[in-house]
């Protein structure tokens, strides 16, 4: 058996012996119908591998979803250790500065007084 380029040269007896082997019969079938004996098994193996590996990829994405899942507002509040109860009315007054946290009383240390405008800043419809 000698090599000339990329083809193998076999003598008559060697070729007959090769044709009787599994590889020889397969090469002959591939030459007759290459899609049926080469392309189709390749595509089937790709699809079967995808279906077989689907379990592993689903586990991978489930772990990813567990790690990066969006938490709802109540779930976030449950994660906080030193949480206080939420009361809309008290929080509104506390944020406005009207309620002292330590005494829970309304602060009466100021009055709301309207600042006098300059004459030229008065609305036009009031001028006569």
Curated annotation (Swiss-Prot):
GO CC annotations, alphabetized: mitochondrial inner membrane
- Work out whether the entry's keyword set contains Transmembrane helix: yes
Location of the protein in the cell = Mitochondrion inner membrane
Q: Which InterPro entries match?
A: Cyt_c_Oxase_assmbl_COX16 (IPR020164)
The residue ranges crossing the membrane are 33-53
User: In what way does this protein cross or attach to the membrane?
Assistant: Single-pass membrane protein
Q: Which Pfam families match?
A: COX16
Out of the domains of life, which is the source? Answer: Eukaryota
Query: Which cysteine-cysteine pairs are annotated as disulfide bonds in the entry?
Result: none
What is a biological process (GO) this protein takes part in? mitochondrial cytochrome c oxidase assembly
Keywords assigned by UniProt, alphabetized: Membrane, Mitochondrion, Mitochondrion inner membrane, Transit peptide, Transmembrane, Transmembrane helix
Q: Which family does it belong to?
A: Belongs to the COX16 family.
* Record's function text: Required for the assembly of the mitochondrial respiratory chain complex IV (CIV), also known as cytochrome c oxidase. May participate in merging the COX1 and COX2 assembly lines.
- This protein is called what? Cytochrome c oxidase assembly protein COX16, mitochondrial
């Amino acid at each position: 058996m000698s090599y000339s380029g990329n083809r193998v040269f076999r003598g008559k007896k060697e070729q007959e012996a090769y044709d009787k082997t599994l590889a020889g019969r397969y090469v002959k079938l591939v030459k007759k119908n290459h899609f049926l004996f080469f392309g189709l098994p390749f595509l089937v193996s790709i699809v079967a591998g995808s279906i077989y590996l689907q379990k592993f990829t689903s586990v991978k994405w489930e772990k990813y979803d567990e790690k990066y899942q969006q938490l709802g507002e109540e779930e976030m509040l449950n994660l906080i250790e030193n949480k206080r109860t939420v009361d809309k009315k008290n929080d509104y007054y506390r944020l406005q500065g009207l309620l002292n946290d330590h005494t829970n009383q309304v602060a009466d240390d100021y009055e709301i007084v309207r600042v006098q405008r300059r004459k030229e800043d008065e609305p036009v419809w009031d001028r006569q």
